């Protein structure tokens, strides 16, 4: 008993000593985490070189665009063919993908041989043979009458220029078909099919096996965005942001990059990591100096590395008593499967003995222990190197997405990963150690090269179908120049109807006289109060206007809220509250009891009979104070002042915010004769000739007309421009059938139009994987500010996704592109419609004055104009295009509703004083 324990102890110690000896000898092959992180850092740099246009030509890691722009989302369906050519045999497959709530993939395939004479013959012979095999397969399945989409896995070095265009760089794997290198493989296969003439197919996609692996796994797990192969060769691909791929035009979305990482180190980057054994393998290979990383990690070289180490150690008399057999001295005799078997057996030492005996050796126990340990070190290094480069890829994706913690899946294929007993586990553990801030799942690919090609095709088909469907839906929102000219013409007609006494009553564009008959001339001076009431908050302002050398405007203001019970109470309560706030402001400014001229910006629909008389037609914006509609708001304000008996005010002018905007800008620019607001709502005003304002007596001079153009189209004159989405937004609004033009182009409604389009797309499976969230059903979630943010040029798609997530909408990268596209189309139409309306206004001014050309400035205010990244530019371009005889400048207003009311009051006081003199 004691003897057997002693013997076991002796062997354990012996083994331990031998392992230590090998570990010491192969010290440089055992890589610390510190070294692996350094390799990872170097690989990141190489990736960046491959992506950048300037360094791509000399980069060793080529980072080739694959033109695969999306991974599966699980809604793919249809029948597809796949060709898989990567060796002496090739396969034809029929892949049926169903999506009836249960994702299912059915495959039938047949393997065909490629005879040596065809591999070495002409390209025509090779592709005729492939087309013949394809015909045979389709015959058997009786599908020759169908024109099916086909994906082609072509595992040879290619330069891809489109998804369905791929130029062969050079043959490998024993192929030498003449006249193929440098040519597009897809064209060659198409021509071969045409020569036959007995069937037709639609070649949609050319992919390599790594991409196919990612796509296969992507169908089962939508987080899969990396493909990895570790077999006879090694490579990886991943989904990169388009904005970083300099070699392809476009910044939107993502594209799969075929890294060709086997060439990492070809420029000397890994020279300090490579050992003498790596150098020896390279020198004896078919392609010295190339694919150096692959030679350190892939199955083609793993067994050979072990053999070279054994030979060197034997020559140094560290193994086999210094003796070597001819078999062990023969390249390729120690295979990678031997490495797997030695490491896989419970008694790996015994397996090592069997392999060594097969190779004509007579090993001792120590030799077998050493061989087992060498296999472990070589395969562990392979897994570690693989993990280092994968860590770089994961870190890059994480940074691209701007996420604190990345959740991602890696689709993996290849004999080393699948068949080596410990490779997968070692790789996974090392990756998780190197990138602890990533949650990584490894998914084994089942038939990546066949099913994957079909999946790329299925995704391309889905994207193409969805793109066509979306284009068709968005088409009515894209207005041609002719359509915009027609909108301009109709606006002019409606303006004439609003000005005419005869048609005014039935005209939707009311063209209301404002009794503002002059713009500022710069001589205005004095202190004025201004009230600005247009929502749940209102402002009281003191505006000091100076002329002469100190010309300018100085403002002080205070904001007060209007509680809901007052908004919904009586008119007396509302105006008493307003007067209370004025009293508070005067006390705050140290002006208690002072009587000043007052301008009142009152942004509700009114009929104005004088500058200081304005009849409220109806409350909007949530106000419901009783006893106000049909009453003069100036009288209501004066009565409230008298009730308080604390101060008196001279109410000189009631104005709306559009006129205030024109006057504010008119103070800065004497050419300003038009006011425009494009914010939550939209309206315009302009200086009209008095002779055309039939509702007011007098022919001389000009008067500002408040167009109230938001109601353009309320008589049905825009029905042919209204889409189903405009109709839906109108029907669910607080005022159906009213303000139709405003509902097509103002900030309050653009988000709702977008939301309705997104719901339509989702219902039809074109967006959000066909899943409508409760959040998307919620009216009003798409505020104008989100549209502005989403369309911002400096915003990456990840940030668009973040905005959508904030709105409770889980989206993919593709979804983000679509949402951005919808926002762009809706906002562009809004800007163009606004431009068409403005073109009608400035052209009318020009024609009124009988001018060939008009120079005019438009004062503009409103969040949509000021904050949206493209609205202003598109609108200005539209005006320029539709009113070419007008030289129109746009001046942004600063506080039109407050400062503007004071300036109207100042102008009125100036004119009144001049009249008194």
UniProtKB/Swiss-Prot annotation:
Q: Which Pfam families match?
A: Hexokinase_1 (PF00349), Hexokinase_2 (PF03727)
GO biological process terms on file: apoptotic mitochondrial changes; canonical glycolysis; cellular response to leukemia inhibitory factor; establishment of protein localization to mitochondrion; fructose 6-phosphate metabolic process; glucose 6-phosphate metabolic process; glucose metabolic process; glycolytic process
Q: Where is the signal peptide?
A: none
Q: Which residues bind ATP 1?
A: 30, 84-89, 425-426
Task: Spell out the residue ranges making up region: Hexokinase large subdomain 2.
Answer: 656-895
Keywords of this entry: Acetylation, Allosteric enzyme, ATP-binding, Cytoplasm, Glycolysis, Kinase, Membrane, Mitochondrion, Mitochondrion outer membrane, Nucleotide-binding, Repeat, Transferase
Q: Where in the cell is it found?
A: Mitochondrion outer membrane; Cytoplasm, Cytosol
Spell out the residue ranges making up region: Mitochondrial-binding peptide (MBP).
Answer: 1-16
Q: What is its pathway?
A: Carbohydrate metabolism; hexose metabolism; Carbohydrate degradation; glycolysis; D-glyceraldehyde 3-phosphate and glycerone phosphate from D-glucose: step 1/4
Molecular functions (GO terms): ATP binding; D-glucose binding; fructokinase activity; glucokinase activity; hexokinase activity
Chief location of this protein within or outside the cell: mitochondrion
Q: Record-annotated residues binding D-glucose 1? A: 155-156, 172-173, 208-209, 235, 260, 291-294
This protein's encoding gene: HK2
Source species, domain of life: Eukaryota
Q: Which InterPro entries match?
A: ATPase_NBD, Hexokinase, Hexokinase_BS, Hexokinase_C, Hexokinase_N
Protein name per UniProt: Hexokinase-2
Q: What does this protein do?
A: Catalyzes the phosphorylation of hexose, such as D-glucose and D-fructose, to hexose 6-phosphate (D-glucose 6-phosphate and D-fructose 6-phosphate, respectively). Mediates the initial step of glycolysis by catalyzing phosphorylation of D-glucose to D-glucose 6-phosphate. Plays a key role in maintaining the integrity of the outer mitochondrial membrane by preventing the release of apoptogenic molecules from the intermembrane space and subsequent apoptosis.
Q: Which GO terms describe its cellular component?
A: centrosome; cytosol; mitochondrial outer membrane; mitochondrion
Renumbered residue ranges of the record's region Hexokinase small subdomain 2: 521-655
**Region entry Hexokinase small subdomain 1: which residue ranges?**
73-207
Q: Which residues form the Hexokinase domain?
A: 16-458, 464-906
State which Enzyme Commission number(s) the record gives. Answer: 2.7.1.1
Q: Which residues bind D-glucose 6-phosphate 2?
A: 532-536, 657, 680, 861-863, 897
Q: Which family does it belong to?
A: Belongs to the hexokinase family.
Write out the residues that bind ATP 2.
532-537, 680, 747-748, 784-788, 863-867
Task: Map out region (Hexokinase large subdomain 1) in residue numbers.
Answer: 208-447
């Amino acid at each position: 008993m004691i003897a057997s324990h002693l013997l076991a102890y002796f062997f354990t110690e012996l083994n331990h000593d031998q392992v230590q000896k090998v570990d010491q000898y192969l010290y440089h092959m055992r890589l610390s985490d510190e070294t692996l992180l350094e390799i990872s850092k170097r690989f990141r740099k190489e990736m960046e070189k491959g992506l950048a246009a300037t360094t791509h030509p000399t980069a060793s890691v080529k980072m080739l665009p694959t033109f695969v722009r999306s991974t599966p989302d699980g809604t793919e369906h249809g029948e597809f063919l796949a060709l898989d050519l990567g060796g002496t045999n090739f396969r034809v497959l029929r892949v049926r993908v169903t999506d009836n709530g249960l994702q299912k993939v059915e495959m039938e395939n047949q393997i065909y041989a490629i005879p040596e004479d065809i591999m070495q013959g002409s390209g025509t012979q090779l592709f005729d043979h492939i087309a013949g095999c394809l015909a045979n397969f389709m015959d058997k399945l009786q599908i020759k009458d169908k024109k099916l989409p086909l994906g082609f896995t072509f595992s040879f070095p290619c330069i891809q220029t489109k998804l369905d265009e791929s130029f062969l760089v050079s043959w490998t794997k024993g192929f030498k078909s003449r006249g193929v290198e440098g040519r597009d493989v897809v064209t060659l296969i198409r021509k071969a099919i045409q020569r036959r003439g007995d069937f037709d197919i639609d070649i949609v996609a050319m992919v390599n096996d790594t991409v196919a692996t990612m796509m296969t796994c992507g169908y089962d797990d939508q987080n899969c965005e990396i493909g990895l192969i570790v077999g006879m060769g090694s490579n990886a691909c991943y989904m990169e942001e388009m904005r970083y791929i300099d070699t392809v035009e476009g910044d939107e979305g993502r594209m799969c990059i075929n890294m060709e990482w086997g060439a990492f180190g070809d420029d000397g980057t890994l020279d300090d990591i490579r050992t003498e054994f790596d150098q020896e393998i390279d020198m004896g290979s078919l392609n010295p100096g190339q694919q150096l990383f692959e030679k350190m990690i892939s199955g083609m070289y793993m067994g050979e590395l072990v053999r070279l180490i054994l030979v060197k150690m034997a020559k140094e008399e560290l193994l086999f008593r210094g003796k070597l057999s001819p078999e062990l001295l023969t390249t390729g005799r120690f295979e990678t499967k031997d490495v797997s078997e030695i490491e896989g057996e419970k008694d790996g030492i015994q397996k090592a003995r069997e392999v060594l005996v097969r190779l004509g050796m007579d090993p001792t126990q120590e030799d077998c222990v050493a061989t087992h340990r060498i296999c472990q070190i070589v395969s562990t290094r392979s897994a570690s190197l693989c993990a280092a480069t994968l860590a770089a890829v994961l870190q890059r994706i994480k940074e691209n997405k701007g996420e604190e913690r990345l959740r991602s899946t890696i689709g993996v294929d290849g004999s080393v990963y699948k068949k080596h007993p410990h490779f997968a586990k070692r790789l996974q553990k090392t990756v998780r150690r190197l990138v602890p801030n990533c949650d990584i799942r490894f998914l084994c690919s089942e038939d990546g090269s066949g099913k994957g090609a079909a999946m790329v095709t299925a995704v391309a088909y889905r994207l193409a179908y969805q793109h066509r469907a979306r284009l068709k839906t968005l088409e009515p929102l894209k207005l041609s120049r002719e359509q915009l000219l027609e909108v301009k013409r109709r606006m002019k007609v409606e303006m004439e109807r609003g000005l005419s006494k005869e048609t005014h009553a039935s005209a939707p564009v009311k063209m209301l006289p404002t009794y503002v008959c002059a713009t500022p001339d710069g001589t205005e001076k004095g202190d004025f109060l201004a009230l600005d009431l247009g929502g749940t908050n209102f402002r009281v302002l003191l505006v000091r206007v100076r002329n002469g050398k100190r010309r300018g405007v100085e403002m002080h203001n205070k904001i007060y809220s209007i509680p809901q019970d007052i908004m919904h109470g009586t008119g007396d309560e509302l105006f008493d509250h307003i007067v209370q706030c004025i009293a508070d402001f005067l006390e705050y400014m140290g002006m208690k009891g002072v009587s000043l001229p007052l301008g009142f910006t009152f942004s509700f629909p009114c009929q104005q009979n004088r500058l200081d008389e304005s009849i409220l037609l109806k409350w909007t914006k949530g106000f419901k104070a009783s006893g106000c509609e049909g009453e003069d708001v100036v009288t209501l304000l004066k009565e409230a002042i008298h009730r308080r008996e604390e101060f008196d005010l001279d109410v000189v002018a009631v104005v709306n915010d559009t006129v205030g905007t024109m006057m504010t800008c008119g103070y800065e620019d004497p050419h300003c004769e038009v006011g425009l607001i494009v914010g939550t709502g939209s309206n315009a005003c302009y200086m009209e000739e008095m002779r055309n304002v039939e509702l007011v007596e007098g022919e001389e001079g000009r008067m500002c007309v408040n167009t109230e153009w938001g109601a353009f189209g309320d008589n049905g004159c825009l029905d042919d421009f209204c889409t189903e989405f405009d109709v839906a937004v109108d029907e669910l609004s607080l005022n159906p059938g009213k303000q139709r033009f405003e509902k097509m182009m103002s900030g309050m409604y653009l988000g709702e139009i977008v939301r309705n389009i997104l719901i339509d797309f989702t219902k039809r499976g074109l967006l959000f994987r066909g899943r409508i969230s409760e959040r998307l059903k919620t009216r009003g979630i798409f505020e104008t500010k989100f549209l502005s943010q989403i369309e911002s040029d400096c915003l990456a798609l990840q940030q668009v996704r973040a905005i959508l997530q904030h709105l409770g909408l889980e989206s993919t990268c593709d979804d983000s592109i679509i949402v951005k596209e919808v926002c762009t189309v809706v906002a562009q139409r809004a800007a163009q419609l606004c431009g068409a309306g403005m073109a009608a206004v400035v052209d009318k001014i020009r024609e009124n004055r009988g001018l060939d050309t008009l120079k005019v400035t438009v004062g503009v205010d409103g969040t949509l104009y000021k904050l949206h990244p493209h609205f202003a530019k598109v609108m200005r371009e539209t005006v320029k295009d539709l009113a070419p005889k007008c030289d129109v400048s746009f001046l942004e207003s600063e506080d039109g509703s407050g400062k503007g009311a004071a300036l109207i009051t100042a102008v009125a006081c100036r004119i009144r004083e001049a009249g008194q003199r």
